[in-house]
């Protein structure tokens, strides 16, 4: 079995997350021109990894992307947006499959690929400002998701949070996207992306694996 995030012990994964957060904070502190640091993990070749070894990447950017800027403006108009359109809606649709005192995990919707979402419940929505218990709560659910999906599923782990220059509430959340299909000509021409696993089926797959 390949050494993926899911094959770590919970403690190892927590330290891995902590190390990533420390690097994230350090980049902001060491370069005043950085406006956003994107954090991601590509697992296996189909998900963009050059080598099949575990690693996270942090990229400093001197601006906020158009997509993120639009999302932040939506959150400014509706401060409860992430509850209305994500966590609460997932609850109404019975898509939540794991929760602890500090975070909640659910089968997400609206993505090109089957996606698991893990949202922090912490009031402070920058990872480096959260308590060790809050970080561990996030880490435990992210680790559980990786363990449930196994090491043979190519995926992208993407981090989202409030950058220092933004003054609105953006909860720290992590998306794990299963890169199990390859968009081709149909998707390019129609802009219709066929997702072969619906959120409820994805939820059931993960729940079954968590019980094993």
Where are these regions (language model features)?
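HIT superfamily nucleotide-processing domains
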Residues: 1-212
